[in-house]
Every structure is written in C-alpha cells, then in structure tokens.
C-alpha cells in the first residue's frame, strides 16, 4: 500500500483479540483500519490484496447504554472483547494514546438476504474514551454530501417488521420513504434511526438493481423470498457495472 501512495499512519499491531491491524488515510483524510479478513467472496486480483468493508468503529459516550442498540437490536450479539486500557494498535490515530474502553461485537449467525454472500460477515467496535470529556460528535457542522463518511447502512429485508421492532426497543424511524424510492437505475425503500448519541444508521431494502446495464438486465427483488441468496454468478456479473477511472 505504501508503494501505491497510501498514507499509512501506523504499523501492524495486535488488537485485543490477537489479530493484526493498522491504519491509513485516504486523500481526504478519512481513516481506514486494515484488518485480517475472515470472510471472502472472491479474489479480485488487486495488488493491495484488500477486500471490502468488514465493519466499523463507532465512538460512544456511554458504552453500556449503546449496547442496547448494537447488540440487542442489530443482533451483533457476541462480544469478542471488552477491555479498557491504552491500546498500541490505536497509537497512530489522533487521541489513540488515551485510555479508552473497547467492545468488539460480531454476529454468530450468518446473515441472510440477496446480497449476504457478497457483503460477508461484519463486526462493530464501540469505543468510549475515559480520559477526555470534551468530545465532538461526528456529524457536528456537517451536511449530507460533505467529504467523508456519512452514516452506517444495512441491507435489510422486511422493513415493516424491522420498523415495529425498532419502535418497541426505543429506536423509532426518524425517516421512512415508505414506498419504493426511485434512484434511476436502482430503487428501494430506505429508513433511518439514531443511536443514543445521534449517530445515523440507515436501513435499505433493495427493490430493483441492475445486473448488467449494457444489456438492460435488471432484477426485481421486491418479491424475493425472505432470506434467499442471489446466485454467486449473478453477484459477480454486477461487477461489470462499476465505473472505471
């Protein structure tokens, strides 16, 4: 990655679960953590040997309170670790030398749905600083479309049932398109909730998606049986839609 011009800001260090990870920045200053992969859809042959998104790190003000959403509602039910210290694998990032509490969550049951095999297993790590009380919310003074990360998004099936579940757990939808939102070549229903600190989480139920646009081949997922996977060959065919620089 260094040979390809990436700004690597830390060397590989062991995380609390014993695996190796390091951090780098993109040209806009966004932080990425590179971790050892546990699930692979296929080999792209890219020289970086990197896969797709495997998870996210989210800062919270009250970790125990935040677990209600991420563990109990979003079903990342297994705690890989729950530790409080100054962690060497964080030393390269701003504020990384401070004492903090970290809880990494994973889902033990494989996800189901049209794109589950492509997206693979994921994890969520919650971090609460215990030394610094003056913290900045990630969306403070930001607008949709600004450079950088916007929100965490989940591909879902059964939006109506999810809406009821979130309301019962105390996380009502703040936005709900209700019907299919037409995005031109694709379409679906989307909604948002907020965690205890106001961090945005989006749910998207895909209704229409292009498989091969040049051939006019689209697939309607609105009546797709719940939990059914799209064939692997079809998911691979979607790669021909990517924009090449």
Language-model segments: what does each one mean?
Residues 6, 156, 171-175:
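Catalytic cores of nucleotide-enabled group-transfer and carboxylate-activating enzymes in metabolic
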Residues 13-14, 95-104, 125-127, 133-138, ...:
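Intrinsic, low-complexity N-terminal interaction/targeting segments
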Residues 59-123, 168, 184, 245:
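Core segments of cupin and vicinal oxygen chelate
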Residues 21-45:
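Short, structured interface segments
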Residues 1-7, 15-19, 168, 178:
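An N-terminus-focused feature that recognizes amino-terminal "leader" regions
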Residues 39-50, 208-240:
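A short, polar/charged loop-to-alpha-helix boundary motif
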Residues 1-3, 20-25, 52-61, 106, ...:
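Vicinal oxygen chelate
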